[in-house]
Structures are given as C-alpha cells and as structure tokens.
Design a protein with these regions (language model features):
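Active-site rim/loop-helix segments in enzyme catalytic domains that contact anionic ligands
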Residues: 1-109
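Short N-terminal targeting/anchoring amphipathic segment
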Residues: 109-115
Length: 115
C-alpha cells in the first residue's frame, strides 16, 4: 500500500511533524521507500504575546527553523515548505487562501496521499 508512494504531510505548527507523525513517517521512509513533502503552515510562536510581532520573536523563529531542519534530518523528510501564517490565528485568514496554499503545494508535489 505504501511502497514507493509520495506522501504530503500538512501540519499547523513546527513540531507537529514530530509529535503527530514523526515515528510513522520515519518508518514509512525507511521501510517502504516513500518520498515525503512536509508543509508547515504557521510560524508557531507569535501567539505567545498579545500582538503578532515577527521582529520581537526573531531569535526564537530562527531556533524554530533550525529545529525544523533537524527534524528533517532525523525523520528523513525529503522536502519541506515552511510558511509564516499567524500562529493560532488561522481563523483570521480567508479559508480560500489557506486552501489555495495547500493546493499549490499539492499540485507541485503530486502526492499519492496526504496526511
């Protein structure tokens, strides 16, 4: 069922790719030779303050980016797209814009399945 398939993983925040699917994806990559593309929608940190200020959280966002690259190596994800949608504020976005973002990645990667 999974052998040599293309799987796109869509997560809301950095670290969801580890907590939610990390072990499963690691197994599928190593045992079934799946090709993976990880799509992270949100930046994962600015909701810790009242106002969304990317400059204020710049050093933490850099650490997040390093952690994402480390998870790519550990799990074995083949490619990653990281977006900077507002953390825990997806409801402030037009649903169509969110769908278009996911569909654009899906069209580019052409997965057999999406998690």
């Amino acid at each position: 069922m999974f052998k040599n398939k293309k799987i796109m993983i869509v997560v809301a925040h950095p670290d969801d790719e580890i907590l939610g699917l990390g072990a499963t994806m690691h197994r599928l990559i190593n045992s079934y030779n799946v090709n993976t593309h990880l799509l992270i929608l949100g930046e994962g940190i600015t909701s810790r303050s009242d106002n969304r200020d990317l400059k204020k959280w710049n050093s933490e966002l850099k650490i997040h980016k390093q952690n994402i690259m480390e998870s790519k190596k550990l799990i074995g994800y083949h490619s990653i797209s990281v977006n900077k949608l507002p953390d825990n504020r997806f409801d402030s976005l037009a649903l169509l814009d969110l769908i278009k973002l996911i569909e654009k990645e899906k069209k580019k990667f052409k997965p057999d399945m999406v998690f």
